[in-house]
Design a protein with these regions (language model features):
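Alpha-helical transmembrane segments of multi-pass inner-membrane proteins
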Residues: 112, 131-155, 159-160, 170-247
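A membrane-periplasm/extracellular boundary helix in multi-pass inner-membrane enzymes
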Residues: 143, 149-153, 228, 245-289, ...
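A conserved mid-to-late transmembrane alpha helix and its immediate loop/hinge
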Residues: 184-186, 221-224, 230, 315, ...
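N-terminal hydrophobic segments of proteins, predominantly signal-anchor/transmembrane helices
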Residues: 3-26, 36-108, 393, 440-441
Length: 441
């Protein structure tokens, strides 16, 4: 197995198979879970066992700046939050330099797949390999998913001895959402959607999968996705598969860019009270009153948390639950934090939010400038599909809280590919210029 393929499988395999909500907490070190352990293991093997040189920073200047801010901003958060929070009987200690160091280490561990991505998964061959890994992983994982759809989410309990989340949240429409080992049915549905998009791209490339048409397998994975009972993932799949099959890669990338810009500007519009909440609620109510009420509950909680963020807007409130809102008399937690964006903004403020989300969005935004240099049709199809997958992963961070190692790997891989395309275009231009001068002589 090649290094690139092993890197892809190690990050994705750990996400799919290791237990969710399991943490090993060492003193003076951030908690270790399946995300951080797999990230460190993959990095350690590549660097110290295989002896591969790993670039810690991309060539792109803005990328370097965003990484450094992402890693170091918790120091300022801790420095500006020394006071405790007292609400009724609840006491939350002030931030200390130990907390800053722990957060900086945690941020560094989270970003390791991004670094591995732009170091190793950076050419057309490895990008197509990425799609194959997603396709095979989706087919493999569909079996336990279908089992849990039929018999309820039991595998995590049987294998690891506990259930990682609220069981009631996995009950939908008289049946069950599969959970397997990822931790929540919505995350499983998003993975199924990603696998469907990968197989659909292989179908576009006319690549059979083990002798079977990728189109037939797309229909199968589409059926599995429907059984996951996630409306959002169905919308994502419909949009991405439709774009991949019907739109040019250039248009796909344009749509991806618009999506990530909307994600970045959404908190700004909410903070400025320019987001049309009432109009969106009215539209949702026309389709389903239950979904409209759920949306209103989510938006109301975001408003409560945004009001709290305004008191420490730049660098946030820090960890230990300081970003949440409590009743000052009873100490009761009044917060429901669903979206990743509001969690990051509450903990690390606007600086932390912009560092994380702009770093994830940077490859998508830059891709519009390099697609014209990709001449091969197959490479353009793959480039467009991966850009769309990354964009929709960023969009999903608005309603959901989990940014997976796979999302960071996608972002790093796309940034590495962009750097390679720009380098080759520069070399080609230099060679043409040299030939022109030689001919003139």
């Amino acid at each position: 197995m090649s290094l690139e393929r092993a890197t892809l499988w190690s990050i994705l395999g750990a996400y799919l198979l290791l237990p969710a909500s399991t943490v090993v907490d060492f003193p003076a070190f951030p908690p270790l879970d399946k995300v951080t352990i797999s990230n460190v293991s993959a990095f350690f093997v590549c660097r110290f066992i295989l002896g591969k040189r790993i670039k810690l920073l991309p060539n792109l200047g803005i990328g370097k700046i965003l990484i450094l801010i992402y890693i170091t901003s918790p120091f300022m958060t801790a420095f500006l939050n020394p006071e405790p929070i007292i609400a009724g009987a609840r006491f939350i200690k002030g931030m200390e330099y130990y907390d800053a160091l722990s957060a900086i280490i945690r941020q560094s561990l989270f970003i390791l797949p991004f670094i591995l991505g732009f170091t190793f998964i950076r050419d057309s061959k490895t990008h197509e390999e990425l799609l194959w890994v997603l396709a095979y992983a989706g087919l493999f994982y569909s079996l336990p998913m279908l089992f849990e759809v039929r018999f309820s989410p039991q595998l995590h309990t049987w294998v690891y001895g506990f259930f990682p989340h609220n069981f009631g949240q996995q009950m939908r429409g008289g049946g069950f959402r599969p959970v397997v080992f990822i931790g929540h049915g919505l995350l499983v549905a998003f993975f199924a959607m990603s696998s469907l998009v990968a197989v659909s791209t292989l179908w576009k490339l006319r690549k059979p999968i083990k002798g079977y048409s990728a189109g037939i397998i797309s229909l199968y994975l589409g059926g599995v996705l429907i059984l996951c009972k996630s409306f959002a993932s169905l919308i994502y799949a419909s949009l991405l598969v439709g774009l991949i099959q019907l739109a040019s890669p250039k248009r796909q990338i344009l749509v991806a860019k618009v999506l990530v810009l909307l994600v970045i500007f959404y908190p700004m519009l909410r903070a400025a009270d320019w987001f049309p909440i009432n109009n969106i609620y009215s539209i949702a109510a026309e389709f389903s009153e239950d979904r409209a009420q759920s949306l209103k509950f989510r938006l109301d909680n975001e408003e409560i948390l945004l009001t709290h963020v305004r008191n420490k807007a730049l660098f946030g409130w820090g960890s230990w639950g300081r970003n949440r809102v409590y009743d000052m008399e009873s100490g009761k937690d009044l917060s429901v934090t669903d979206g990743r964006w509001i969690i990051v903004m509450g903990e690390y403020g606007w600086v932390g939010f912009l560092a994380e989300f702009c770093l994830l969005a940077l490859p998508v935004i830059r891709s519009t400038k390099v697609i014209r240099y990709v001449k091969d049709r197959r490479e353009r199809v793959v480039f467009g599909a991966i850009t769309l997958l990354l964009a929709i992963s960023i969009v999903d961070l608005l309603p959901n809280a989990s940014v997976s190692p796979w999302t960071w790997l996608l972002a790093g891989a796309l940034l590495g590919r962009i750097e390679q395309i720009k380098f080759r275009a520069k070399v080609r231009t230099t060679n043409l210029h040299t030939e022109f001068i030689d001919n003139e002589r």
